[in-house]
Amino acid sequence: MTTPRSLADDLRARDDAALQALVRRRPDLALPTPGDLGQLAGRSVTSASTARALDHLTRFGLQVLEAAVVCEEPFTLPQVRALFPDTAQADVDAQFDDLVLLALVWGEPDAWRPTIAARETVGRFPAGLGPTLAVVGGGTPADLVAALDEAPAEVREVVEALTWNNPTGRVRNADRVVTPETAKTPIEWLLAREVLRPLDKGTVVLPREVALHLRGGRLHRTVTTEPPAPDLHHHDPVVVDRLATGTADEVVRHVGTLLERWGVAPPAVLRSGGLGVRELRSAATLLDVDEPIAALVIELTKA
């Protein structure tokens, strides 16, 4: 089997059933009908289409996608599983397969990659993690972990505040030179040992490897594979029937008012057979309702 070099190659290797499943889950990709699989791949990586696909993911689906973004490319499925140590492997695998089906992740078992659009849509700090040491520079993960093991309690409090949420903090002169001997504050202690790294003159960041160590290797504090139970409210059937009757009476009155007015002064009709915006607004004013409600009354009157 040829290794796919792009998402387009990945799609070309899929069978008809897989492509049909992709279009069913992401129907915007088929409107208008793409000329070829290259065009389908191009549409699937647009920001708008990717954001729409993410909107339909479950919370767990988003968490697994964040894991795919966090892993260094190319990555393998076991690397994703490792970020969910307390979650059943079968659940992670099933959700990952769904991301592949949706063309949010592509590749092959030994070399998976999230699409660039998926990475950008997830955001700069996936799962609240900062950039890697390869990006921000600094010591090795082992050196930083060893430094944290010797950190005073007040220093640990600062690091823990950046562990699960926003990995950045605002600090004046964040890029100043500090040594272990000259450090006077918890922030300076961390800067001197490169546990925190400057992003710019006023911002420090906790490197990804440090945060993952403090999280115990977990990407998320809590993981729920099942969708949340809907918040259902009980309504008295008598009250529901009373409201429905009142609404029906109101609709009948609106239809009568519309027929009475249009029987005397028929509205102008477009060449296509519909009503123009001006006529819709006039009907809404006549009925003293919003335009969507006026449009519904007009449709009911026509029917």
Q: Where are each of the predicted segments found?
A:
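Short, amphipathic alpha-helical interface elements at domain boundaries
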Residues: 1-303
